[in-house]
């Protein structure tokens, strides 16, 4: 019988990478929503 929370699958590299990239993208998107112009520094 398959356990619902299989720790070997959850701790595998693709799952950890997907969670990490989703979290990072969410942080950047929310930061850009509240502070829209801080991620792009113009040269002038």
From Swiss-Prot:
Query: Main localization of the protein?
Result: membrane
Transmembrane region(s) = 9-29
Which cellular components does GO assign to this protein? photosystem I; plasma membrane-derived thylakoid membrane
Recorded source organism is Prochlorococcus marinus (strain MIT 9301)
* InterPro entries, per the entry: PSI_PsaJ, PSI_PsaJ_sf
The membrane-topology field of this record reads: Single-pass membrane protein
State the UniProt keywords alphabetically.
Membrane, Photosynthesis, Photosystem I, Thylakoid, Transmembrane, Transmembrane helix
Q: Which Pfam families match?
A: PSI_PsaJ (PF01701)
UniProt-annotated location(s): Cellular thylakoid membrane
- Main role? May help in the organization of the PsaE and PsaF subunits.
Per the record's keyword annotation, is Membrane included, yes or no? yes
A Gene Ontology biological process in which this protein takes part is: photosynthesis
Give the protein family. Answer: Belongs to the PsaJ family.
For this entry, the protein name equals Photosystem I reaction center subunit IX
